[in-house]
Every structure is written in structure tokens, then in C-alpha cells.
Swiss-Prot record:
Transmembrane segments: none annotated. Pathway: Amino-acid biosynthesis; L-isoleucine biosynthesis; L-isoleucine from 2-oxobutanoate: step 1/4; Amino-acid biosynthesis; L-valine biosynthesis; L-valine from pyruvate: step 1/4. Residues 72-149 form the ACT domain. This is Probable acetolactate synthase small subunit. The keyword Thylakoid does not apply. GO terms for cellular component: acetolactate synthase complex; cytoplasm; mitochondrial nucleoid. The keyword Amino-acid biosynthesis applies. Keywords: Amino-acid biosynthesis, Branched-chain amino acid biosynthesis, Cytoplasm, Phosphoprotein. Stimulates activity of the acetolactate synthase catalytic subunit ilv1.
Length: 289
């Protein structure tokens, strides 16, 4: 009886197609005595101790190779011949690639300052520093790595005003002379049109380069009909960014002086904090106990 009744209700449910208000009652009557199937629980496999240790070893990442750290040395040396060769020989013997080396005189007579920027491991750099200090002509070696300092580098860059399409014209002088002789045989009207197009090209190129130089607080050192020389004094990273932005315009020549560094003066708040730490408190003002 119950199965026959369920069959009738099922046929009625099919005819209604879940549009009637009594469709939920029909559904509950059909599925009242049918329990929902239980989800099968799959237990994870239990690994043994050797398998667990092997899994941990295989999943542990390897130690990444540390990049060579950037070191900045400031050497105070005697102003005499042969000091630079002895110092560079020590660095070359240990395989250092010197990023920058600047030598200049100081305000003191017979005293020069060398600013060296190199990359290498801390232990190897420390050994090279001690060997440099052992040179007779070296007064002191100051390590500015990790300290608050001011770094500046001067850049002179010659950029083309003809655009990237005419970049090779600066290196092909013979073809340029031949083209200029052939251009004289052309009509005056065609020559005026080419001159106007070249003038507009130079003006747009000059405006874009000048705007970029202004954003980096640089200045124009020299300008001609085909090239412009830019001057920028900034940090080494800022100079690298400026050069990368100038490359699409066509950099003909670039000259960098190298890094000059000088430590910053301590701030007033740092001095006061150190002074407060050194103040001794009298026992009278201490709490009891």
C-alpha cells in the first residue's frame, strides 16, 4: 500500500513539475523514509618514522645563494705615487670586482681620499680591509657599509636630438656627407620641407629630454643641432634609473665619475638619547625596595 501510494504521489509530482504550492509536501512524502547516504571518510595514510623524516628533508628548501653584499670603503692615504697600484693589487688578488674607485685630494696637504665600492662576502672583505691597513702609505680605512651616509655620483650623457630612427647617422659620417651632397642637387622646395620636418623632430625630442632632466633635477651642459649633453649629480641608483630612461632617445656617450661618500652628522635627538642614558639616578629618588 505504501509503495503504491508513493508511486501515485510521484506521478503527481512529475505532472506538477514543482510549480504547485504542495510540491514541498510531495517531496517530503517521497523522501521521508530514505536516509541520506553517508560520506565516505578516507583516513590519511600513516607514515612511518623513516618516511616522515624523508618527507621533511625533501620538502625543506635549499639555502639560497646569498648575493655579494655591497661595501663602501673610504681610505685616507698619503699622496704619493704607487699607492693606488698596491691597493688595487690587493683587491685583484682576492678576485674583487671594483664597482667604483674615486681618488681625490683633500683639504689637507699630502693627504688623499679613496672611495672604493665593491661586492663580496663579509669575511673576505674584512681580510682585504686588514691587508689594506697594513700598507705603509695608508693612514686609515673607514668602512661605511650599513652606516648613514651621503652618496653622490656625477653623470655626463650625450643624447641624440634626431630620435631613435636616425640614431645610426651619428656613426655613419661618410654616408651622411654623401647624402648632403646629393641633397644639394634637389629642388629648393623639397629641401625646405625636409628642414622643417627635421626642425620639428628636434624640437619635440628636446622638449621630452628637457622635461625628463628637470624631473631628475639635472641640467643641460651643452647643446648643438644634433646632440645635447646632460649633467646629473645624484645617488648611483638614481643615475642608473636616469640612464635607463634616456636609452630610448639614443644615448651616444655616457661618462660617470664614480661614487663619492661621506657620513652624515648625528641628529640632535640621537645625541640627547645617548646623554639621557648616561645620566646617573640618585638613590634618594628611587622607590623603596
Amino acid at each position: 500500500m505504501f509503495a503504491r501510494r508513493c508511486g501515485r504521489l510521484a506521478n503527481r509530482f512529475v505532472r506538477l513539475k514543482s510549480t504547485s504550492a504542495t510540491s514541498p509536501i510531495t517531496y517530503k512524502a517521497l523522501h521521508a523514509n530514505s536516509p541520506l547516504p553517508r560520506c565516505r571518510i578516507i583516513e590519511p595514510p600513516r607514515a612511518t618514522v623513516p618516511e616522515a623524516v624523508s618527507n621533511i628533508i625533501m620538502s625543506t628548501p635549499f639555502n639560497r645563494v646569498q648575493r655579494p653584499k655591497r661595501h663602501v670603503f673610504n681610505c685616507l692615504v698619503q699622496n704619493e705615487p704607487g699607492v693606488l697600484s698596491r691597493l688595487s693589487g690587493i683587491l685583484a688578488a682576492r678576485g674583487f670586482n671594483i664597482d667604483s674607485l674615486v681618488v681625490c685630494a683633500t683639504e689637507v696637504e699630502n693627504l688623499s681620499r679613496m672611495t672604493i665600492v665593491l661586492r663580496g662576502a663579509d669575511e673576505v672583505v674584512e681580510q682585504a680591509k686588514r691587508q689594506i691597513e697594513d700598507i705603509v702609505s695608508v693612514w686609515a680605512v673607514l668602512d661605511y657599509t650599513g652606516t648613514s651616509m651621503v652618496e653622490r655620483e656625477l653623470l655626463l650623457a650625450k643624447v641624440s636630438l634626431l630620435g631613435p630612427d636616425h640614431f645610426q647617422e651619428h656613426f655613419e659620417r661618410s654616408e651622411k656627407v654623401a647624402e648632403s651632397t646629393n641633397a644639394k642637387a634637389k629642388s629648393d622646395g623639397e629641401g625646405v620641407m625636409n628642414a622643417n620636418a627635421a626642425l620639428q623632430l628636434r624640437a619635440s625630442q628636446l622638449a621630452a629630454i628637457n622635461q625628463l632632466t628637470t624631473l631628475f633635477h639635472g641640467r643641460v651642459a651643452d647643446i648643438s643641432t644634433e646632440t645635447i649633453i646632460l649633467e646629473l649629480t645624484a645617488t648611483p641608483d638614481r643615475v642608473d634609473n636616469f640612464l635607463s630612461l634616456l636609452r630610448p632617445y639614443g644615448v651616444l656617450e655616457a661618462c660617470r665619475t664614480g661614487t663619492s661618500a661621506m657620513t652624515r652628522a648625528p641628529h640632535s635627538n640621537e645625541v640627547t638619547e645617548e646623554a639621557e642614558d648616561d645620566v646617573e639616578v640618585e638613590e634618594v629618588f628611587l622607590p623603596p625596595g
